[in-house]
A protein has these predicted regions:
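Glycine-centered coil/turn sites that cap beta-strands in beta-rich domains
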Residues: 254-268, 272-286
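Extracytoplasmic Ser/Thr/Pro-rich, glycosylation-prone low-complexity segments
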Residues: 1-253
């Protein structure tokens, strides 16, 4: 027999991937894991004197120690590499990887969280005598919120290469990746979008998602301006949460007369499958 379980929508979480990560967004109402958009400005230019600032014009990375151990895809990490191109990696790297691709794939950084993976730069302010572009500094601000035991990384004044020649009118991306460690569990990852555009028509747009240390498992929220049926288009004020916490209405039911437990679960397909087919064989005729 085959049963096709119901049609999911944008108010449902995306996933799981092969490891068990789901992506909840702030429009997934009715789930305990749904994130709430709560922007906390880190940039000292915005009045917060706590954030540390990494300045770069283009294609740079910086590796910093974490104040806690963070488990991701079952592996414990103690540092994070931040890239000007909108991602972090838990494995130190000197590669900035500006060319985004689908997740998972054997390209780009390992053990990655792509908050807004695309070719990002500081604002273009002119050209030099040789005709080379001149960029202002992009700002990456990072801070440990000890009161809430979370680590926040913010990208500010990050301009999209696709519209970079527009100068101050170019598309600016301002977003945060927030790490929440858990005791002896995979940590939660929240991404918040303060200002966001996705203009790269000919450059795969941006990629948002997570990927493991072997680049074999991952969960894409969006790539090439394509979204799973359960995802919401990136907009200002959107929050995402990547977590291994299953939806509240997941029910496992064991029956002693059956050799294998049966699980009842609302349809949570992998990113681009609109339905789930459950196949089974009855032990005897009913």
């Amino acid at each position: 027999y085959a049963i096709t379980a119901g049609i999911p929508g944008t108010d449902d979480p995306t996933g799981p991937d092969e490891y068990g990560y789901f992506a909840y967004d702030s429009t997934d109402l009715g789930y305990s894991s749904t994130p709430v958009y709560e922007w906390m400005e880190l940039d000292p230019e915005g009045g917060n004197l706590l954030g540390n600032v990494f300045l770069s014009q283009d294609d740079s990375v910086m590796t910093i120690p974490l104040p806690f151990t963070f488990r991701f895809y079952g592996v414990d990490y103690i540092s994070v590499t931040m890239s000007t191109n909108g991602w972090i990696s838990f494995i130190p790297t000197d590669q900035s990887d500006f060319y985004n691709c689908y997740i998972p794939a054997a390209l780009g950084p390992y053990a990655m969280v792509a908050g807004y993976w695309d070719d990002l730069k500081g604002m273009k302010t002119g050209v030099d005598e040789s005709g080379n572009p001149i960029f202002a500094d992009m700002r990456i601000i990072y801070w440990y919120d000890s009161a809430n035991n979370r680590y926040i990384i913010e990208w500010n004044k990050a301009y999209n290469q696709y519209t970079i020649d527009l100068g101050p009118a170019a598309s600016m991306e301002k977003f945060q990746i927030i790490l929440y460690p858990k005791q002896e569990q995979d940590g939660d990852i929240v991404i918040q979008y303060h200002t966001v555009d996705n203009p790269g028509i000919t450059t795969n747009y941006c990629t948002v998602g997570i990927e493991d240390h072997n680049q074999l498992r991952g969960l894409t929220y969006t790539h090439a301006n394509t979204y799973p049926v359960t995802a919401t288009t990136l907009t200002p004020g959107l929050a995402l949460k990547f977590t291994t916490t299953w939806p509240d209405n997941y029910v496992a039911n064991e029956d002693e007369t059956l050799p294998i437990p049966v699980c009842n679960l609302r349809n949570y397909p992998n990113p681009f499958n609109p339905v789930t087919t459950i196949s089974f064989t009855a032990k005897q005729k009913g």
